[in-house]
Design a protein with these regions (language model features):
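Structural signal for the C-terminal ends of transmembrane alpha-helices
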Residues: 25-31, 108-117, 188-199, 259-266, ...
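A conserved hydrophobic secondary-structure block that centers on an alpha-helix together
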Residues: 11-25, 32, 95-226, 234
Length: 661
């Protein structure tokens, strides 16, 4: 009965989604207030029914209802409770339901936090989001029903993929989906602006906080996925340029460009058409990621094995949404004024250059991801594109972008002078150069890669400090400086914090890439190996077991200069149901380094192959991501998006001349 309730709730949600996508948009076109008023209750009702369906599926997993095919395929009676809950979104069908649930959460957010917006704007935005819901609910009900019955019921389930039986995977998909799907709000605002014929600063102000919050979630989701791969897969790597990793990274790159472009459109009225195009592309790449994961064209630890017909459905939906959006853009954008002009050297030109570099970087990642798939689909042959391609193409595009990141915030709008910029940033450049010389030498060996990476990171931090100092210059003493700092918008501090986060990330990537070391060694009880100034002693292996697995657990003691540092216990697990061997690494976490040990396989009566790693500054990679996310949250919480906008923006919108309805 519970699965049938969930199924019926999805049907009702689809009905409301149809009403949400048709009536409000038609009402906005006709000026019919009653039809426009349908948008909010339809979106809220849709959320209620999708949440009921999600709860029914979660209950089926928790209750071990193996008469549901989804549960029988992705769970087991021995699976711990928290992983049974996480198994709700561990399958293709369940994760698709999570996708729709997240979409309805964003829709409800629009209904709650956009009460100050004109009714026709909200109607169009929610109408577009309703259309997206119709597509995914239809896809789920007709090709990927999470409540399909299995009769007679299975005596037990096949178990959840052991790779997913990890706390990181409990939180990684929801965070990632909140980012993926969050770009649908910016997309919907852009389409609403195109439909209304009002591509002005107003729509940019309305959509900017939504875009920033979505970017924050996507940043956290990607970072958590990277950290999960680092400690769970046993390879010691934090990014593999896996096609599905790339599928989440591409919208992040374009979303980063969109966040900056929205700022220019809001503050200066420029980049109007460009910003709309970025909003379309960011969500298009989110849909592309959905296609890659669910179409069956990929082999990946992230991908779902699915029926190719599902891929055709998603591809058709992708073509309709993106093709329709681009056609509307081509029709409307030519009527939009370009905004005020600006010189070749100005903050606008620097931001535009950075946008182009980010878009080119996303394009290079897309080429490396899709080109092998296209060759395979055309029967030309199989080709593997690995890290050497991505690092060779991606890094040269990002280096100038990182340099411009230090110049842009201090440059003047409209027109800036190079001599003036050089004068204001001379100390930042000096600090960056000195730091780039000192840090590699302090690491014990000079590396050109390390020096270049530290130069860029130190440049970003020093120029951010110079930008803040320039802002308070001439404030008239300590009291004036404090007053100026208090009056500075949160969005400004959020920008600086996010930029510092990128610098910290670059430090982590540069130093771990330049100075990490690893060894694969055969170790028996009593054997030792030295790495990175640490001595690892293999004490032996004993058998242990968990709720649904058995494991061989090794013990290694780590010392430095005769002083005990850590005791590490890596495991080699065998999950009983699927007979899947898994490596559980043991890590001693430190602010400046990680000591990483993985137990590979037995190579004798008492001997094992052991992989040991010394990774300096690797934690700064994820620390930088956290700082980026905190900067985004700080920017999104700017009071300008809550106070004053309620009175100013609708009035400005209503006063806009020549708007098409």
């Amino acid at each position: 009965m519970i699965p049938e309730i969930g199924q019926f709730a999805l049907v009702l949600a689809l009905t409301l989604a149809l009403a949400q996508c048709v009536l409000p948009v038609a009402g906005a076109a006709r000026g019919n207030a009653a039809w426009m008023a349908v948008a909010r209750p339809a979106a809220q009702g849709q959320f209620v029914f999708v949440a009921i369906a999600f709860g029914c599926l979660a209950w089926s997993f928790v209750a071990n209802d193996f008469s549901v095919l989804n549960v029988a395929t992705n769970s087991n009676s021995q699976l711990p409770l928290h992983y049974r809950v996480a198994a709700t979104w561990g399958s293709h069908e369940g994760s698709l339901l999570l996708w729709v649930l997240v979409l309805t959460i964003w829709s409800v957010g629009v209904t709650v936090f956009s009460r100050h917006l004109p009714d026709d704007v909200v109607a169009r935005v929610l109408g577009v989001m309703g259309f997206i819901s119709v597509g995914f609910l239809s896809f789920m009900l007709f090709t990927s029903n999470p409540f399909d019955r299995l009769l007679p019921p299975a005596p037990d389930g096949r178990d959840l993929n052991p790779l997913l039986q990890d706390p990181g995977m409990v939180f990684h998909p929801p965070l990632l989906y909140m980012g993926y799907v969050g770009f649908s709000v910016a997309f919907s605002f852009a389409i609403a602006a195109l439909l209304a014929g009002r591509l002005d600063a107003t729509w940019a102000r309305w959509s900017r906080p939504w875009t920033t919050v979505a970017w924050v979630f996507l940043t956290l989701g990607i970072a958590l996925g990277s950290f999960w791969a680092y400690y769970e897969l046993g390879w010691g790597g934090w990014w593999f340029w896996d096609p599905v990793e790339n599928a989440s990274f591409m919208p992040w790159l374009v979303g980063t460009a969109l966040v900056h472009s929205l700022a220019v459109t809001e503050k200066r009225g420029g980049f109007k058409a460009w910003t709309v195009l970025l909003a379309i592309l960011a969500f298009a790449l989110s849909l592309l990621g959905t296609f890659l994961v669910r179409s069956g064209v990929l082999t990946s630890v992230h991908a779902f094995a699915t029926d190719p017909k599902r891929g055709i459905f998603i591809l058709a939906f992708l073509a309709v949404v993106v093709g329709g959006a681009l056609a509307l853009f081509a029709w409307r954008a030519q009527r939009v004024s370009t905004g005020g002009g600006f010189d070749l050297v100005s903050r606008e030109s620097l931001l535009l250059t950075n946008n182009v570099l980010l878009l080119a970087a996303a394009g290079s990642v897309m080429l490396g991801t899709l080109y092998p798939l296209a060759l395979d689909a055309l029967g030309i042959g199989k080709l593997s594109v690995g890290p050497p391609y991505f690092e060779t193409v991606f890094v040269p595009l990002m280096a100038p972008a990182l340099f411009l990141m230090g110049v842009g915030p201090i440059a003047r709008w409209k027109k800036a002078a190079l001599p003036e910029l050089a004068l204001r940033l001379r100390w930042a450049l000096a600090v960056a150069v000195v730091t780039a010389l000192i840090v590699p030498l302090a690491m014990g060996r000079f590396s050109a890669l390390a020096g270049f990476g530290i130069l860029l990171a130190a440049w970003i931090i020093a120029s951010s400090a110079a930008t803040l100092a320039d802002r308070v210059k001439g404030s008239g003493g300590a009291a004036g400086i404090v007053s100026r700092l208090r009056g500075t918008p949160r969005a400004y501090y959020g920008m600086l914090l996010a930029h510092v986060g990128i610098a910290v990330f670059v430090v982590g990537v540069t130093l771990v890439k330049s100075y990490e070391s690893e060894k694969d060694v055969r170790m028996a009880p009593g054997d030792t190996v030295e790495l990175g100034g640490y001595v690892f002693r293999f004490e032996g292996v004993r058998d242990t077991q968990g709720p649904n697995y058995v494991a061989a657990r090794a013990t290694l003691t780590v010392t430095q200069d005769g002083r005990a540092v850590a005791t590490l216990r890596p495991e080699r697990r065998l999950y009983r149901v699927q007979e899947s061997p898994m490596t559980e690494a043991a890590i001693d976490y430190g602010f400046f380094r990680h000591i990483y040990v993985a137990l590979a396989e037995p190579v004798g009566a008492d001997a094992w192959l052991v992989r040991v790693h010394y990774k300096p500054f690797v934690s700064w990679i994820w620390g930088g991501c956290l700082l980026m996310a905190l900067g985004g949250l700080l920017a999104a919480s700017d009071r300008r998006y809550r106070i004053g906008a309620r009175e100013r923006q609708p009035a400005a919108y209503a006063a806009e001349p020549g708007a098409a309805r």
